[in-house]
């Protein structure tokens, strides 16, 4: 996915790669979510490593320290990720939920 936020292109893979390197993160999926000001912004869905309890601000600040600030997720949600039987993350399920009632332009 490419997120277009205020005219800037943000690669979800690039953001995920940085968040995966956070010591408290086991899994992550980043998707675009609607935003009234920027059109779309990144949102990260994070599965913490067992016994770890990172805060949303920790993930956002960590990402900002490795990428341009506008690429950091505006929102972080913790919990399990929807997956296929083979273990692939089903980002479309996350997108469908977040975009319910909105229309994605790009």
Where are these regions (language model features)?
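Acidic/polar alpha-helix N-cap and adjacent early helical turns
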Residues: 98-106
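AMP-binding/adenylate-forming catalytic core of the ANL superfamily
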Residues: 1-71, 80-82, 87, 93-96
